[in-house]
Amino acid sequence: MALSKRELDELKPWIEKTVKRVLGFSEPTVVTAALNCVGKGMDKKKAADHLKPFLDDSTLRFVDKLFEAVEEGRSSRHSKSSSDRSRKRELKEVFGDDSEISKESSGVKKRRIPRFEEVEEEPEVIPGPPSESPGMLTKLQIKQMMEAATRQIEERKKQLSFISPPTPQPKTPSSSQPERLPIGNTIQPSQAATFMNDAIEKARKAAELQARIQAQLALKPGLIGNANMVGLANLHAMGIAPPKVELKDQTKPTPLILDEQGRTVDATGKEIELTHRMPTLKANIRAVKREQFRQQLKEKPSEDMESNTFFDPRVSIAPSQRQRRTFKFHDKGKFEKIAQRLRTKAQLEKLQAEISQAARKTGIHTSTRLALIAPKKELKEGDIPEIEWWDSYIIPNGFDLTEENPKREDYFGITNLVEHPAQLNPPVDNDTPVTLGVYLTKKEQKKLRRQTRREAQKELQEKVRLGLMPPPEPKVRISNLMRVLGTEAVQDPTKVEAHVRAQMAKRQKAHEEANAARKLTAEQRKVKKIKKLKEDISQGVHISVYRVRNLSNPAKKFKIEANAGQLYLTGVVVLHKDVNVVVVEGGPKAQKKFKRLMLHRIKWDEQTSNTKGDDDEESDEEAVKKTNKCVLVWEGTAKDRSFGEMKFKQCPTENMAREHFKKHGAEHYWDLALSESVLESTD
């Protein structure tokens, strides 16, 4: 006998499990073939022949189990038909399914629906996201739960049928059919009612649990969106109406119950421990998160780097762990020696400061420093030379000065005549008369321009009169069109206007071409600018010497170097402690601009990084005295330049600085600047 589609659907899960148990894996082809055999009503032999290509040796065993399952399903459906009406009534009381009871009461015979099968008319399901929430039962899960409950009932019935023998009943037409069923499928009415009550109770508990879950999810609508509505719709689809849970009850906190001793207990009187939430620091929270992250990294499986194309096994990966530091023990007395050295240094500095202070008060310090500035002499201080330097020119070498009355002829250059030294031309000829330019007024300039233009026009007229050049075309404009052309303008005004406009465009083009021809090129403009900045120094070079107390700021160094280069000035900057000498050479205009830069534009009193620490240690008076500033030491002229392009020279000692100037023949610049610095420090 062929089975219906509904019976095949109920049998399909069992066939899938049996195929997986027989073959060791699931095979949809075998399941489909087995369902076709049962659906077409084949006997065991035909079914075995049909399934033999798929199962081989296990065909007969699988076919026997398949037909036993079919017979058991039929017998269970016949045995449940007698208690169908009472079961529906109980389901109505539990789940409130009025639609099915109304259909039964109409008297029209409908198709019988198994106890846990889905109803045909499903309520409208609210669409949700494709992925279900983990805490929500889906339609498939509820169905599987119902099937598991049904299997438990069937197994329980089998166990009870083996334990207790069936009670004899009189043979009646109504009971003749159950007698033909197998013994394992017979059940007493009282046992059926007990099983039914158990199933109803389980279904009620599942519905209540699902309702609680949906109520909790309803309190947090942003958590899973509309997915919580899918579970409620699935409950209605299964024929279960979950009880409504009031949201206001869920939002209220659990009541606190205390016993006589003040301990927290639950409803049964058992002592419970409440969770105490204590405030903590963000640092502790970050530490916990950091530890969790490290744990996840440890649990994360390492990637297979060898499969990477760029993997090089020769390169070793450095471990990320920090290397442990070993102990370093100090020798005994090490810090005592360091402290003693520091104390000795402090005492020495204090003694030097006292000596320097006493020298400043007596003036010895100033005279000593000024004496050191002068160049070294071959003779010692206090020695009397044999011949003074002014006598060395007239006394010959090897002259014996021990004679009492030397002769006049023995001396060189002594005559009765007055010797006049040869006159030398000055390096700069300042006797040239300076002619002042004549500056005309605006009225005189216009008059001179008119006269020049009139003379040029007169020459052109003479050339035209002599026939040396054709007469120029009349200068026609839109304003004098009718006056110049006359009848021609009246006959064809459009043609005349076009002719006039063409002449105007021609004159404009000639004017622009003349301007472009007079315009200097980029190279010519560059040469003109350089010529303007480079002044004529053939009559003498103007020199300025500046002294700066502190020139450690790189920004100020850059300003000096950049402006000297832009003004085409030469010179040198010698860097020494408290005496920084800047020498610049160039024309008078460039010197004027550079002087304004050094004395006004640069703010020298701004505190620099090097003077910051010194000012903290010194007193207020010394700090005022040592305020950074720039002083013009000397300015004048010389015949030639002594230095090249502007450069910086670091000189730790005074001798080194003087030697650098002496190499260029300008050591007197350093002596002058240093002497002024010494005199200023003693004031």
From Swiss-Prot:
Region ranges (Mediates interaction with SART3): 416-550
Which keywords has UniProt assigned to this entry? Isopeptide bond, mRNA processing, mRNA splicing, Nucleus, Phosphoprotein, Spliceosome, Ubl conjugation
The segment annotated Disordered runs over 73-135, 153-183
Cross-link Glycyl lysine isopeptide (Lys-Gly) (interchain with G-Cter in SUMO2) placement: K139, K244, K252
Among the entry's GO cellular component annotations, what is one?
A: U4/U6 x U5 tri-snRNP complex
Q: Do you know which Pfam families this protein is assigned to?
A: PRP3, Prp3_C, PWI
Known Gene3D superfamilies for this protein?
PWI domain
Q: Which GO terms describe its biological process?
A: mRNA splicing, via spliceosome; spliceosomal tri-snRNP complex assembly
PROSITE patterns the record matches: PWI (PS51025)
Q: Where in the cell is it found?
A: Nucleus; Nucleus speckle
Q: Which InterPro entries match?
A: Pre-mRNA_splic_Prp3_dom, Prp3, Prp3_C, PWI_dom, PWI_dom_sf
> For the modification Phosphothreonine, which residues carry it?
T167
The PWI domain is annotated at 1-87
Q: Does the keyword Ribosomal protein apply?
A: no
Write down the superkingdom of origin.
Answer: Eukaryota
- Post-translational modification as stated in the protein's UniProt record: Ubiquitinated. Undergoes 'Lys-63'-linked polyubiquitination by PRPF19 and deubiquitination by USP4. 'Lys-63'-linked ubiquitination increases the affinity for PRPF8 and may regulate the assembly of the U4/U6-U5 tri-snRNP complex.
Which positions bear Phosphoserine?
S164, S619
Q: What does this protein do?
A: Plays a role in pre-mRNA splicing as component of the U4/U6-U5 tri-snRNP complex that is involved in spliceosome assembly, and as component of the precatalytic spliceosome (spliceosome B complex).
What does the annotation say about its assembly with partners? Component of the precatalytic spliceosome (spliceosome B complex). Component of the U4/U6-U5 tri-snRNP complex, a building block of the precatalytic spliceosome (spliceosome B complex). The U4/U6-U5 tri-snRNP complex is composed of the U4, U6 and U5 snRNAs and at least PRPF3, PRPF4, PRPF6, PRPF8, PRPF31, SNRNP200, TXNL4A, SNRNP40, SNRPB, SNRPD1, SNRPD2, SNRPD3, SNRPE, SNRPF, SNRPG, DDX23, CD2BP2, PPIH, SNU13, EFTUD2, SART1 and USP39, plus LSM2, LSM3, LSM4, LSM5, LSM6, LSM7 and LSM8. Interacts directly with PRPF4.
What name has this protein been given in UniProt?
U4/U6 small nuclear ribonucleoprotein Prp3
| Source organism per UniProt | Pongo abelii (Sumatran orangutan)
Q: What is the lineage of its organism?
A: Eukaryota, Metazoa, Chordata, Craniata, Vertebrata
